[in-house]
C-alpha cells in the first residue's frame, strides 16, 4: 500500500478504516490472512464516497457481512474489504411490507417481522449471517428462498444507487444475478399478516430442527457445497466415506457432512485441500462434480 492510497481512502470515509486487518477476525471459519484495508462505512452515502475513490484508483474490493459463505486464503486480500455492519436499520411499511438494510442479521429480521405481526420469513430462523449475504446468495431452507419474498432490491453499482423491482430480478437456487461490482444495500419484503403466537411457534420449530441437524460445535461457514440438482451434498459426501475426514485443523463435521469445521488452529489452506479431496472422492464414487457454495477469495 502507498501513502497516497492510504491518505485518499482516509479522506473519503467518515466511518472506520483499518490497515492490515486479519480476516480471520471477520470470517465464520476463523481463518484468512490480512486485508490491506478494512473499511466500515457509516451509511450508504459514506459507502458511495468510498466507492468513488476505490473505482477511480482501480482497487480490488470485497464486501463482507457476517463472514459466512466465505473463505479468505492465508495470504489475505490485496485491496479494500468493506463491512456493511453499520447498515442495520429495519422499518415496517404499509401493506404488510418490511424494509431491511444489508447489515441486519437474519435473526434480527425474523424477530422484527414477528414483532410487527408479519409472517413469511420464519424459514430463515437459525440461518447465520446478514441480510445482504442472504440476498446475494438467495439463501433458503425448507423449500423456501429469501428472494421469493422480495418486492424490491436497493443496490450500489458504479457509484449509483438503483432500485430493482421483483419482475426484473434474475435469481435461482443459491444465486442472484448481479452486475459486476454491484453491492446489495437493502430490500423491501412483501409479507402477510399473521398471528404472533403461531409465527413464534414456527420459528421455534425451525430453530429446533436446525439445532438437531446442524449443531456442529465448531467454527464453520455454513453449507460448504451446493446441492446438485435432485441430490443432497451431505449425502454424497457421507456415501464417499468422508465423515470426520480431517486435514490439519479442517474437518468434515461428524454431525453434518456438508459442514467443514475448524477444529482449532486451521489454516485456509487446510480447508482448500480438504475441499479438493471431497470433490475428488465424490466424483470418483458418484460421477457428480460438487460446486462450492462458499466463496473463495484472496491470495495464497
UniProtKB/Swiss-Prot annotation:
Localization per Swiss-Prot or TrEMBL: Cytoplasm
Catalytic residues (positions): 174, 223 (proton donor), 293
The keyword Cell cycle is assigned to this record: yes
Cofactor(s) listed: FAD
Principal location class: cytoplasm
Pathway: Cell wall biogenesis; peptidoglycan biosynthesis
GO annotation terms (biological process): cell division; cell wall organization; peptidoglycan biosynthetic process; regulation of cell shape
Disulfide bonds: none
E.C. numbers: 1.3.1.98
NCBIfam families membership: murB (TIGR00179), PRK13905.1 (NF010480)
Family: Belongs to the MurB family.
Protein name: UDP-N-acetylenolpyruvoylglucosamine reductase
Name of the encoding gene: murB
Amino acid at each position: 500500500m502507498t501513502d497516497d492510497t492510504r491518505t485518499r481512502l482516509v479522506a473519503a470515509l467518515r466511518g472506520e478504516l483499518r490497515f492490515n486487518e486479519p480476516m480471520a477476525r471477520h470470517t465464520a471459519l476463523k481463518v484468512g490472512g490480512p486485508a490491506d484495508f478494512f473499511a466500515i462505512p457509516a451509511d450508504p452515502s459514506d459507502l458511495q464516497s468510498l466507492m468513488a475513490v476505490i473505482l477511480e484508483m482501480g482497487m480490488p474490493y470485497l464486501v463482507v457481512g457476517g463472514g459466512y459463505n466465505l473463505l479468505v486464503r492465508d495470504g489475505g486480500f490485496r485491496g479494500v474489504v468493506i463491512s456493511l455492519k453499520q447498515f442495520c436499520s429495519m422499518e415496517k411499511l404499509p401493506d404488510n411490507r418490511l424494509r431491511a438494510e444489508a447489515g441486519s442479521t437474519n435473526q434480527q429480521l425474523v424477530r422484527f417481522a414477528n414483532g410487527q405481526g408479519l409472517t413469511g420469513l420464519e424459514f430463515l430462523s437459525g440461518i447465520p449471517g446478514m441480510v445482504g449475504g442472504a440476498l446475494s446468495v438467495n439463501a433458503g431452507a425448507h423449500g423456501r428462498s429469501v428472494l421469493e419474498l422480495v418486492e424490491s432490491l436497493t443496490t450500489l453499482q458504479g457509484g449509483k444507487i438503483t432500485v430493482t423491482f421483483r419482475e426484473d430480478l434474475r435469481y435461482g437456487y443459491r444465486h442472484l444475478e448481479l452486475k459486476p461490482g454491484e453491492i446489495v444495500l437493502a430490500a423491501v419484503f412483501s409479507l402477510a399478516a399473521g398471528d404472533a403466537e403461531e409465527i413464534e411457534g414456527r420459528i421455534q420449530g425451525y430453530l429446533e430442527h436446525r439445532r438437531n441437524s446442524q449443531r456442529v460445535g465448531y467454527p464453520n461457514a455454513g453449507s460448504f457445497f451446493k446441492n446438485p440438482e435432485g441430490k443432497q451434498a451431505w449425502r454424497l459426501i457421507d456415501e464417499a466415506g468422508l465423515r470426520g475426514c480431517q486435514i490439519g485443523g479442517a474437518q468434515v463435521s461428524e454431525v453434518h457432512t456438508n459442514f467443514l469445521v475448524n477444529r482449532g488452529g486451521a489454516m485456509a489452506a487446510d480447508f482448500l485441500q480438504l475441499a479438493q479431496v471431497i470433490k475428488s472422492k465424490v466424483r470418483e464414487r458418484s460421477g457428480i462434480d460438487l460446486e462450492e457454495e462458499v466463496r473463495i477469495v484472496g491470495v495464497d
